[in-house]
A protein has these predicted regions:
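An N-cap/entry alpha-helix motif that binds or orients negatively charged groups
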Residues: 1-33, 97, 102, 106-107
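Glycine/Thr-rich beta-alpha phosphate-binding loop at enzyme active sites
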Residues: 11-29, 165-177, 215-269
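Short beta-strand/loop segments at the ligand-binding rim of alpha/beta enzyme cores
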Residues: 37-46, 120-127, 191-210, 263-275
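Conserved, mostly hydrophobic/aromatic
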Residues: 46, 68, 109, 126, ...
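Catalytic cores of alpha/beta
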Residues: 53-62, 141, 210-224, 265-269, ...
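Glycine-rich phosphate-binding active-site loops on the catalytic face of alpha/beta enzymes
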Residues: 64-78, 161-163, 229-237, 285-310
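A gly/proline- and charged-residue-enriched helix-loop-helix capping module
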Residues: 71-121
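Active-site glycine- and acidic-residue-rich loops that bind
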Residues: 131-143, 171, 177, 203-223
Length: 311
């Protein structure tokens, strides 16, 4: 975690002294895309979790990324789970984390977005989640308050109900809980569209640990409630390491790729599919795009390879 934070601080230093272009990629295919009201310069983005507090998204766009997802953000600041909580398995090009939505809270994140957005050239996604101490039955209130905060500033919102590191969060994926939550979110969005005259797409971030039956039901419930697409997928608790937490990286690649094919099969054609999880190289990106992904996110692959992955 310290290494990750130092790397981000170094990126900021390089940006501040106007040397960021030395590290920017000119190899990412640039084309004007329009997907669900999102105007993108390319299909490659940063996944939620890397820029938790919206302090670096403008720098990632300068490096060549077409979109950046910040967060996950909760209403109030959270310290997250006890440290150490990120473990690197270099031989396997894998991470296991038990972070637990550590972030500075919605007020400060919104301030950061307003501060850095004028320097940002890309699509900004904001991942939102319930607070650790919020009971499942009250989680909808957190998400609606967060929509109030971020709807206007976000190019899209990601509903995180799939992190394994916040207690009871995955309970929101059950059909009954999800139906209730997404009905509330859908109703709120209608109000916000009327208020701001802006249709901000809303995506649901999926867990790779769902059964096929649950996954199909989850997608049906989401589309019934006007969700615009899906992010496939979050970290998995199904791993070989003797550590509690969610695994990402190369060891997730096959599971995430297989799940993406199922999501593509189950979803309606109009629903957007963002591939995330185990994307480690250009071949992985191509494979995800071939298998119906509209956009692709990087996280652990970028942690291990840095900007060389873009080149």
């Amino acid at each position: 975690e310290t290494a990750k934070n130092m790397t981000l601080m170094l990126l900021k230093l390089i940006y501040n002294i106007d040397l960021i272009n030395l590290f920017a990629s000119s190899n990412i295919e640039k084309s004007k895309l329009n997907i669900k009201n999102l105007s993108l310069k390319n299909r490659i983005g940063i996944a939620g979790g890397l820029d938790k507090n919206a302090e670096y998204f403008h720098i990632f766009s300068s490096l060549g990324f077409g979109f950046v997802e910040v967060g996950t953000v909760t209403l109030e600041p959270q310290t997250g789970n006890p440290k150490p909580r990120i473990f690197r398995f270099t031989k396997d090009k894998t991470l296991v984390n038990s972070l637990g939505f550590n972030n500075v809270g919605s007020v400060q994140v919104l301030n950061n977005i307003k501060k850095y957005k004028p320097k940002f050239d890309g699509v900004l996604g904001i991942s939102i989640g319930k607070s650790k101490n919020t009971k499942t039955k009250n989680a909808w209130q957190d998400y609606l308050h967060l929509m109030d905060y971020f709807y206007l500033e976000a190019d899209y919102l990601a509903i995180n109900i799939s992190s394994p590191n916040t207690e009871n969060l995955r309970e929101l994926s059950s059909q009954e809980n999800l139906e209730f939550l997404l009905e509330k979110i859908s109703q709120k969005k209608v109000q916000l569209i009327d208020m701001y005259k802006k249709n901000t797409p809303i995506f649901v971030k999926l867990s790779p640990d769902e059964t096929d039956e649950n996954l199909k039901n989850l997608i049906e419930v989401s589309e019934k409630n006007s969700i615009d697409g899906f992010i496939c997928c979050n970290t998995t608790t199904d791993h070989i390491y003797p550590i509690t937490g969610g695994m990402s990286g190369a060891m997730l690649s096959k599971k995430a790729g297989d799940m993406q094919k199922k999501v593509a099969e189950f979803k309606q054609e109009k629903s957007i599919l963002i591939a995330s999880g185990g994307v480690m190289n250009a071949s992985d990106v191509k494979e995800r795009l071939i298998n119906s992904a509209d956009l692709v996110q990087l996280y652990t692959g970028y942690i291990y390879q840095g900007n060389s992955l873009l080149k």
